[in-house]
């Protein structure tokens, strides 16, 4: 009897599909049933081959060998996951298999994952496509009952290949050209470089900003009411001090007459469900977690604990087929402190409204929500518990009714001038009950602060005991932190110098710079290549980053290039543009970029040369600020030697409670704090032992130190193999 091979993107999804299809027999990298064989990728198993696979001369980076423009790009198996590729290959080549079902993520990249495997195996069997937005049993059953012909997604596949090949031609050539021309590792790309440019532009805005003093007026009444002056346009600030001085002087000995009391009943609805970017932003703001760290925590909650849904999503909505599962999800997450909240929601039928249920706004995956799986808090780390708390509270909040309140605005006249006061009375706590009414709102639009208003009637006269001038200064734009940088990457249109509204709209609709799955890696790569650095929570551009922007072609610095690409990739996906035409344009563009870099007369200057020499080649070492501390790296990119000088740890200073920096090597290592505190590593170990009641031993300390160096979870992507070979100067 003939069977169908189902290719899922990850083992966890494969297990869900196999369970529904009754594939119980376990094999080496697959699950088999009477009709189906379910196997899986691990992200990408196949990628574009390295330059040296076309010509051995490309093993060495030489400017004269550029541009590298192979007529046809080849595929290669990623070594890291070659075993699983062979497992998938063996199932595809089975004689009893007559059909392939692509069940990877429903989107451009998911299509590429499966099709590259099929192309590399060189198998020609009929293809069908499972296109679902969630992996519930019902969604899987419905999807298999409505499989689409594979050819319906040929254009989507062509679009995905076009994107990958364009990144190969431009990214690898531009990086090699910059690196060899200026003898410094200067990697660039259509996402990385505009991101660095946005950070540089923000720093320029801050540098060029000139603070202005503004003035206002506040009146205080004998019944402790504070009234704020407003002009005819509703502004409570003025840059004209003489005007404000004159008003204050003219109001002496005037009382306030209540002219109007405006009562409005208002509603505010819960913020939307989390997508990955929004979750990364909140985790950074509340806990200081990096985007990469939040993604890694989410992966564990998704794959290991199975309590949250797929993390790499760009949707803040769920699809209608998920609504029926909400009661079970509420029962699963409704434990501990969440029990009374979940119980309250379950008392009434759940209404699926457009604020969180919208099929049209779910593409590859729905928003991050709890699963129906059992929750065991004792198995969570502290960080996992915090991220889980964010997601569950947001999930509960959207299912609660609106926050309702009555806003009272008091309008008074003092002389001929208008003064107002504002207060709020809560009618129904609604979703804010989930946050114990401590949710931070961002809806403050003026300088009028809400206060408790006394009982007042229209026409009342209020005795004014004090009229005073207030003042403040305009503030420069804030530096980016990881939370705000993620927002800027998601919506870079306000940083674009373009009059092309359609281009800006396309960039916005296609998700901005990078994707939810890649932004954390991109930010991490910018730190690791020393183009940007952290000072506290703020992100600063380095001298190297500044020089990179000065050396790269102008077009690579703007998000516009990504917008133009996305327009054309969208046209390919719709069958309106041939992939070959786009790639031909990219090859010509690559020639222009390489030519511009070759003819540049600019110089790259290392302004961070230390007094240390490289132990391998003897050349000067450069001092750089890595993401987690200071490092020394060899100036010669061919050598690539690097060593840690110091790194920020999770150990806290016993005096000021800030994170300690670990400096030095071996037995001479010492913890240091900005407040001046110093402590040898050996003394630190003794203190830790005493604080833990003499229960700590060497293994505890080693485990602690190992945690500081723990590497992030590897993620297969099309350029993983190519990029890992890069040496950073």
UniProtKB/Swiss-Prot annotation:
The record marks 61, 168, 176, 312 as: Interaction with DNA. The active site is at 310 (o-(5'-phospho-dna)-tyrosine intermediate). Residues 153-594 form the Topo IA-type catalytic domain. Residues 686-718 are annotated as: Disordered. Pfam families: Topoisom_bac (PF01131), Toprim (PF01751). It comes from the Bacteria. GO terms for cellular component: cytoplasmic replication fork. Its cofactor is Mg(2+). One of its GO terms (biological process) is DNA repair. It catalyses: ATP-independent breakage of single-stranded DNA, followed by passage and rejoining. Keywords: DNA-binding, Isomerase, Magnesium, Metal-binding, Topoisomerase. This is DNA topoisomerase 3. It comes from Bacillus cereus (strain ATCC 10987 / NRS 248). The lineage of its organism: Bacteria, Bacillati, Bacillota, Bacilli, Bacillales. The gene is topB.
């Amino acid at each position: 009897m003939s069977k169908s091979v189902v290719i899922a993107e990850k083992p966890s999804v494969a297990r869900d599909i196999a369970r529904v299809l009754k594939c119980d027999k376990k094999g080496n990298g697959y699950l088999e049933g009477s009709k189906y064989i379910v196997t899986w990728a691990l992200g990408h198993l196949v990628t574009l081959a390295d330059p040296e696979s076309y010509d051995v001369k490309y093993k060495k980076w030489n400017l004269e060998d550029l541009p590298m423009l192979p007529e046809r790009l080849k595929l290669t198996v990623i070594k890291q996951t070659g075993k699983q590729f062979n497992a998938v290959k063996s199932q595809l080549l089975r004689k009893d298999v007559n059909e392939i079902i692509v069940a990877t993520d429903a989107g451009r990249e998911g299509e590429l994952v499966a099709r590259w495997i099929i192309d590399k195996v060189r198998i020609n069997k009929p293809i069908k496509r499972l296109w679902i937005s969630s992996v519930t049993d019902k969604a899987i059953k419905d999807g298999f009952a409505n499989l689409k012909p594979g050819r319906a997604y040929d254009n989507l596949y062509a679009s995905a290949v076009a994107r990958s090949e364009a990144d190969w031609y431009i990214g690898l050539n531009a990086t090699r050209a910059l690196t060899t021309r200026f003898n410094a590792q200067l990697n660039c790309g259509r996402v990385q470089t505009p991101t660095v440019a946005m950070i540089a532009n923000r720093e320029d805005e801050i540098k060029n900003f000139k603070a202005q003093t503004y003035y206002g007026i506040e009146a205080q009444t004998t019944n402790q009411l504070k009234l704020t002056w407003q002009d005819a346009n509703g502004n409570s600030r003025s840059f004209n001090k003489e005007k404000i001085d004159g008003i204050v002087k003219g109001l002496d000995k005037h009382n306030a007459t209540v002219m109007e009391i405006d009562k409005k009943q208002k509603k505010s609805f819960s913020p939307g469900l989390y997508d990955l970017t929004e979750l990364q932003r909140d985790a950074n703001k509340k806990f200081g977690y990096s985007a990469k760290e939040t993604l890694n925590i989410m992966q564990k909650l998704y794959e290991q604990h199975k309590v949250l849904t797929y993390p790499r999503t760009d949707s803040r909505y769920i699809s209608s087929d998920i609504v029926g599962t909400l009661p079970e999800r509420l029962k699963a997450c409704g434990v501990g402190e969440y029990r009374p909240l979940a119980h309250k929601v379950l008392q009434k039928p759940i209404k699926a409204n457009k604020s969180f249920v919208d099929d049209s706004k779910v593409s590859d995956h729905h928003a991050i929500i709890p699963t129906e799986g059992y929750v065991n808090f004792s198995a969570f780390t502290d960080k996992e518990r915090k991220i889980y708390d964010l997601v569950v509270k947001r999930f509960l909040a959207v299912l609660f009714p609106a926050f309702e309140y009555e806003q009272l605005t008091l309008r008074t006249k003092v002389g001929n001038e208008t003064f107002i006061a504002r207060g709020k009375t809560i009618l129904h706590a609604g979703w804010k009950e989930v946050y114990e009414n401590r949710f931070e709102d961002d809806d403050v639009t003026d300088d009028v602060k809400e206060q408790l208003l006394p009982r007042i009637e229209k026409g009342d006269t209020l005795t004014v005991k004090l009229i005073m001038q207030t003042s403040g200064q305009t503030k420069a734009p804030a530096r980016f932190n990881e939370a705000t940088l993620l927002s800027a990457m998601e919506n870079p249109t306000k940083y674009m110098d373009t009059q092309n509204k359609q281009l800006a709209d396309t960039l916005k609709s296609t998700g901005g710079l990078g994707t939810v799955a890649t932004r954390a890696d991109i930010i991490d790569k910018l730190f690791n290549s020393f183009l940007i650095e952290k000072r506290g929570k703020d992100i600063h551009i380095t001298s190297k980053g500044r020089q990179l922007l000065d050396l790269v072609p102008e077009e690579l610095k703007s998000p516009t290039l990504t917008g133009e690409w996305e327009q054309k990739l969208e046209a390919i996906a719709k069958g309106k543009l041939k992939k070959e035409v786009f790639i031909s344009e990219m090859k010509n563009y690559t020639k222009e970029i390489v030519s511009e870099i070759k003819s540049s007369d600019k110089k790259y200057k290392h302004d961070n040369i230390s007094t240390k020499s490289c132990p391998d080649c003897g050349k000067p070492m450069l001092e750089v600020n890595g993401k987690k501390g200071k490092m020394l790296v060899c100036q010669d990119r061919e050598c690539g030697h690097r060593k840690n000088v110091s790194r920020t740890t999770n150990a806290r200073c016993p005096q000021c409670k800030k994170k300690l920096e670990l400096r030095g090597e071996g037995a001479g290592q010492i913890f240091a704090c900005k407040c001046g505190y110093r402590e040898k590593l050996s003394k630190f170990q003794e203190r830790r032992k005493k604080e833990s009641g003499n229960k700590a031993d060497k293994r505890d300390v080693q485990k602690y130190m190992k945690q500081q160096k723990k590497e992030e979870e590897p993620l297969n992507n099309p350029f993983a193999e190519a990029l890992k070979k890069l040496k950073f100067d």
